Amino acid sequence: SAIACGESCVYIPCFIPGCSCRNRVCYLN
C-alpha cells in the first residue's frame, strides 16, 4: 500500500528521498 510522505506536490516537487508524486501528493515508493 502507498505510504504518504506528508508532502504535497501541487506546485513543487517532492523533497523527501524515495518519494514520488501521485495525485498531487508525495508517496513513498
Swiss-Prot record:
GO BP term, example: defense response
Disulfide bonds: C5-C19, C9-C21, C14-C26
Modification after translation: This is a cyclic peptide.
Superkingdom to which the source organism belongs: Eukaryota
Cross-link (Cyclopeptide (Ser-Asn)): S1-N29
UniProt keyword list: Disulfide bond, Knottin, Plant defense
Function: Probably participates in a plant defense mechanism.
Similarity-based family: Belongs to the cyclotide family. Bracelet subfamily.
Notes concerning its domains: The presence of a 'disulfide through disulfide knot' structurally defines this protein as a knottin.
Protein's UniProt name: Cycloviolacin-H2
Organism listed in the record: Viola hederacea
Highest classification ranks of the organism: Eukaryota, Viridiplantae, Streptophyta, Embryophyta, Tracheophyta
